[in-house]
Amino acid sequence: MTAKLLYELVHEAARAHGDKRAVAFDSSIAARVSLTYDELIFMSDELTAQLRVSVQNHEGAIGLFCHPDVLLPVWIIGILQFPAAYLPLDPASPPQCSLRMINNCRLSFCLIQNELLHSAFSILISVEVCATFCSHRLTLIKIKSEQKENSQANDAPFSSAVTKNIQQGEPLAYILHTSGTTGLPKIVKVPHRCIVPNIIHLRSVFKMTPEDVVFLSSPLTFDPSVVEVFLALSSGACLLIVPSAVKKMPRRLAHVLFKRNTTTVLQATPTLVRRFGKVVLQEEVLSADSSLRILAFGGEPCPSLNLVKSWRQEGNRTHIYNLYGTTEVSCWASWYKVPDEHLCLEDITDAPVPLGEPMLDTVMEVRDETGHLVTEGEGQLFIGGQNRVCLLDDEETVVKGTMRATGDWVQVQNSNLYFLGRKDRLVKRFGQRVHLDALQQMIESFSGVEACAVNLSKDDRLLAFIVLTSGHAGAPLSSEIHHDKHLTQPSEISVSVSPKASPPSLRVTEGEIRHQLSKRLSSHSIPDMMVFIPALPLTSHGKIAIDELMKTCETQRQDKNKQAPQKDTASVRLKLQNLWKECLGLQDDVVVEENAHFMFSGGDSLQALRLFDDITVAMGTTSVGLLEVILDGSFSDLLSHIMTETHDDAVLPSKKRTADYSDSEASGKRQHKEMTTSSDTESPFVVPSLRRTMGFVVVRRAAEVFKWGFQKIPQGIFSDAPDKNYVTNNSVGNDTGLISNPSLELSKSSAVTNMADHLQAQEETLLASESPSSHGGVREDSTGVLPLALRVLWRSDTGRCVDASPMLLVAPDRTTVFIGSHSHRLQALDLSRGEVIWERILGDRLESSAAISSCGGLVAIGCYDRQMYFLDVSCGDTVWTFETGDVVKSSPTVDPKTGLVFAGSHDGHVYALNPLTKTCTWQHYCGGGAVFSSPCVHLSPRQLYCSSLGGHLHCLNPDSGKVLWKYSSSAPFFSSPHCSDSSVFIGSVNGHIIGISHSGNTLWDFSTDGPVFSSPCISSLTLLTNQPPSTTPSSSVTTSPNHIVTCGSHDGHVYCLNAQNGSLLWQFQTTGKVFSTPFVFSGALWGLRTLAAVCSTDGKVWVLDGETGIQKATLSLPGELFSSPVIWGSKLVVGCRNDYVYCLELTTQ
């Protein structure tokens, strides 16, 4: 091969492709700027000429202190043509590091990007400004000689080494230092003839064309950047450059690479690629239609084929390569292409990926500890070659063909080389060898593990830092690590995440990993401690910052018992500003603007993780979403997140709708709408004519069924036919009816309206068909009772946990499910098929359940961003928003008489909102504590009930907000109040379920063995006195209640109580805690009077006999359940913490 210089390769390409785009710079927030090859060469030649005028004495190297920029290749080529080696200095590095390089390399001149001149290392040394090159945005400085004279004596030989090699015809291309992975950082001087073979060989291996777009993923201080720059520019391709801050924002980076630019070649460390996350990898980076042609891993051990396969979407055609090399023999020494067919196999082995073949002009040898060659077995890898020789530190000359020890231990097997780990990463425990890197790769190969780092602590404890795959089925989501709502006993595995306790599901995951390891490894190789973290921190070169992990672990172990301070906005803002400035190294008098972005303010991934840790310890906020807000949000976003965050996970992009379990997938399309809250974007709405003329039904949790717009209440298909066996709330006016009771009897009647006929046709499994109209028609023995079962009809992916409960809008044309998610999404789904009718992305998380306005045209829902949203039912457009003083988790309630919408807020108030006039009619302070629960309106007597976490239950006049009476408890009320004709009922955190008369007198108090977060479900029922309802001691009650109260408790039971006196009718023990609210409904289709549906937090849905509490059906879902079930016909809808909304069907077996 004829030796060439790097810039000569670019000149050859420019002569053939002068008018093609050579380099593009995309900031992600402004228009892309670019240079053609002709412009690149012209500006490079111009800079070279200016340097030759300004630098009188011939220099071996010129420093380059800059950020990524569209002119970056111009600056590099301009220096190389001088001729001189370029020495990159990182503005993000501490000034002392730059000073060390300057002194050790005896640097005399440095080019500094103009905007960095004031912040450069000149504060530590004396410099002289030689020239300013305005068109190149550079300033040339000279480092005064006294600085070099004061440097250490052992640094002196370097300058002569540079000159000597140039005189010998060995011009240097660049000078940099190693990352320290192979030991103490070394200064490496790389001749052109050492790096040019890399460029030429990879250009051939990758089959480069002028149509390619190569991403500059590496910083200039990391030698793979040389390959990226000149691989593109020697092929006539385009080099894509982005700001350093964008590289640290995975989602934004993916958008820039594959949406704004069609990147075809990506060379990166596995850790950097992992930061995209599985969803982005599958849907953008390695999707079926991805523009990415080449993905080359290097700088770290190649991920397992199992892991790479899990990142790829079916149909992806990206070629995967494994590159190996060391900076001491810059840059790559070997390459291996993963056969495409290997990634398509059903069962991929856990075998490591080979290092592959030597690069052009490269020799690779494996030697044992005595220096003998190894042809089979383990040994240390040595690399070199006649031309692959660099100068290290103070070396002046090196013999051609010198072989450098890499410090990497490999295994030779059938002529293939397999990486085992760094020589210093082969440790002994209990007299046995442990390959730390091999252990790390093995853990990463496990299902549900996205990334891992393994290290040995000073006290010889083997630590594994693990990042779980978000949304992995069958294992806790990475977000679950950060829940603090239902934590149990402390565990050391959570130290890097939070000083709080660890969820049981996380301990299960640890147990699963340990079990898998125990089947493959001896006990000495199994980690002593597993630390689950939201993301691995990176060095500036994109490698795992293991030292930072160890420091973080130790710091949080020491601080894990610290108490979080009071979260008032002023103190949190001040504390956050201080932490922000400390992490960025800013002066105390620096003002942190509300729109300041951490990464754009100079932060990096290590500093982001440090800020995450500091906030975790100082403020007790533990969500994985916290790290994402730090990476891609403003200071204001971060403050808002901390103030509102309590336990849930972060926002991730919504995945595609999952196919039905039992039916073929329906291809419903989503309508994504960005958040709009200002009045300028509020849109008028028109109530659909069918709902306006024929009425509609709203079904909510706790078996609340609202019927609107009827001349008379249809009795054939709705709840509680108004006969002597049922208690029905009075209708309001002639065309609005409210029934707050569940479907206990669904009978056909001549009074069924046209609306009812439409609904009957819509609901195939409606229980109205041929059912008896009174209890007398239901068999009293068991012969008519059919065995029941639950099956999944469909599920819809919301992108994050679903704690909200569904709300159903039953209209003549279809039944729509409305439900929100912690992903900020509100989905409108077709009940029959699960298709997404529309979807809105609101300003923050949604834990509130929705309500429908009295006109039927608006859906109202509260949001973590403090807003109450009123959206057009038909399309999701914003009609009005009302801002409260804090997070809104309370579910709104609609007054059937006035149409006012009542909702609570964490600011402690209840608001009466009029969506038609877009005004707040009144607001009421509930005595202290956030209003988490939902208000309850009762028509006769006309009263509104609201409760707070301060333990206050207030009875108000719904028209004016005037207090009628108050009830106080020593424990908070998370439970929402619900009413019967004579009483209001509520559960308390002290474990009590209380019945209170409408005049405020306590009627009874039932005690459970755990906190009650569940809300009471009130239903009408007449029990036969000759039928024993339960075998429990308290079931000997012979009174026939008009209403029953069904409620869950954290003691794991569902309780059914007599609403008159609070006596126990029956109780049922679930297998988990009961947070959700039961739903009581008709069982006529199955030969039963009533059924009760309830969910336990362990993921189980239960269907019980409403009269006896006997289990009739159950189904386990793959996630925790805090959402309450809602039933219409035979369909049950509920949200799950595995990100999905489920529709189940209750069928006969």
From Swiss-Prot:
SUPFAM superfamilies: Acetyl-CoA synthetase-like (SSF56801), Quinoprotein alcohol dehydrogenase-like (SSF50998). The modification O-(pantetheine 4'-phosphoryl)serine is found at residue 605. It comes from the Eukaryota. GO terms for molecular function: acid-thiol ligase activity; ATP binding. Keywords: ATP-binding, Fatty acid metabolism, Ligase, Lipid metabolism, Nucleotide-binding, Phosphopantetheine, Phosphoprotein. Residues 653-683 are annotated as: Disordered. ATP binds at residues 178-186, 408, 422, 543. It holds the Pfam family AMP-binding. GO terms for biological process: amino acid activation for nonribosomal peptide biosynthetic process; fatty acid metabolic process. Residues 570-646 form the Carrier domain. Its EC number is 6.2.1.-. It is an enzyme of class 6 (ligase). Belongs to the ATP-dependent AMP-binding enzyme family. Covalently binds beta-alanine in an ATP-dependent manner to form a thioester bond with its phosphopantetheine group and transfers it to an, as yet, unknown acceptor. May be required for a post-translational protein modification or for post-transcriptional modification of an RNA. This is Beta-alanine-activating enzyme. The gene is aasdh.
